[in-house]
Amino acid sequence: MSPPAHGSDAKPPPQWAGLKSISSVHEATIHAAVLALLPDPATVRNCLDIAEDAARAVHGTMAAAHIGADPERMIAAPEEVDLQILRDMNEDSPSQRFERIAGAFADWKRVSPDRESLLLDDCRGDLSRCVTAECHETALVVAPCHGNMDARDAFYDLLFREHKLVLVPPPDAYTGNLLAHVVIGWKPHEHAQRAVVAARRWLVAADRITVLCINDKADGSYQRTARELLDQLGLEGEVVAISSGGRSVGETILDFARSATATCLLIGAFKHGYLLELLLGRVTRHLLSHSKLPLMMKH
């Protein structure tokens, strides 16, 4: 399989000033604290807005990268290449998708002079290779979970191949105050613990943290382990235990988040595996489908 292609050596058009794809841009991208991954033109602004907030909250660097599957730049089975070519009929060609993303990125940059130094990396070819190339070293990746095929495939790779901490933008316009009140959905399982540990840098910066324990055991093990983890990580937060009643756990989390005026949710994602969650509609799938808040997660 050939390595992913990073842009070209040609000088970008004037309207794309700042969109150079050179080794220095890629180097800055892979070492950023927060990466806005841009596979879908429809979610560019939300991803960039929330990534900017996430980076600013921890006094870290931000980067932005376009990734896209391109059958002309990949070595793959004929069926995969045919699928990508067929997909172009519905979603435009790889170059057209990049042009739309680059244009949206340039529009976003023009809003604030503070964004002038931010450049857009570009990786096209085999999508999994591009995800690895752009995201492997990044602490937090902001990426959509829905949208075009690139967005859906990249989201899967981020969680299950790269095991990244992923921040999914809300479906509507992002309104700011990312870390005003972070609600953590907690069960004493490894995937939930990994998510909290990975997000510690952002939890330290949060104004308020609530750890939500739903349907705790009789011995109070959910609440006890939640307090222990907060202590181990040097975090201050409230631990709340509630019953789901007749609701699903996903519904209960969202109802609580609304009542508590949460600004971000943090969960351990897909405890039962991706396919089982898709088939049975478990907690992660429900939150991804119905949450109006930014959703931070790690598998």
Predicted feature locations:
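Small/aliphatic-rich secondary-structure junction motif
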Residues: 2-85, 161, 178-244, 262
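Structural beta-alpha unit
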Residues: 1-29, 69, 103-141, 233-265, ...
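Redox-cofactor binding/interface segments in oxidoreductases and associated redox assembly factors
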Residues: 36, 140-144, 184, 267
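Short beta-strand elements of ligand-binding domains
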Residues: 142-146, 166-172, 295-299
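Short secondary-structure boundary segments
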Residues: 66, 145, 268-270, 299
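A short acidic, glycine-rich active-site loop
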Residues: 84-100
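Active-site glycine-rich loop that binds ribose-phosphate moieties when present
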Residues: 149-157, 161-173, 190-201
